[in-house]
Amino acid sequence: LSRRQRQMCIRDRVVMCPADDVEARAAVRAALEYEGPVYIRFGRAAVPVINDRPDYKFEIGKGTVVREGRDVTIVATGICVDSALGAAEKLAADGIEAEVISICTIKPLDEDIIINSAKKTGKVVTVEEHSVIGGLGSAVCDALCAKLPTPVKKIGMQDVFGESGSAAALVKKYGLDADGVYASVKEFV
């Protein structure tokens, strides 16, 4: 099991994966104030700032809609939020409006934001720089299965051994860049 998979099983444990440096700082501050164990996963790659809106407010257990859409919901975490936004732009050029939800807190998961978006779009894609087993995708599937059965596609590391390399090369190899996410979502929709 990966470290994140083990963390998901521990009661009252918070699991976070920030999308950018703004969210990373906010997550660390929240972790210091939280009464209980917290695991924060930081990616290696530099990413653009996503959460620079004046109204941005970080809260453990709350996701953020970073792009409105009507045809498909893309739920992403960590560095994959930027990839999801890039894919959404490409999809828009094809007439597919993707709603993008940034999930920093994987546990506890903001089920309401995901379910409300799934009601609107009818399809959900998860994107994570992690195994598709036991991470964000599994948590989203659990929530939807219990409350709103919805078709879901999980984009992430399949059940294979990882490889070494630069962050950019690995993100591209495993289809986690904007082009890879675009192709997967387009095929799914």
Model-derived segments and spans:
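Structural signature of the thiamine diphosphate
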Residues: R11-R53, D179-V189
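Single conserved hydrophobic/aromatic residue that forms the stacking wall/gate
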Residues: L1-I10
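A generic local secondary-structure boundary/capping motif
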Residues: R4, V15, A27-A30, G61-V65
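Thiamine diphosphate
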Residues: G43-V189
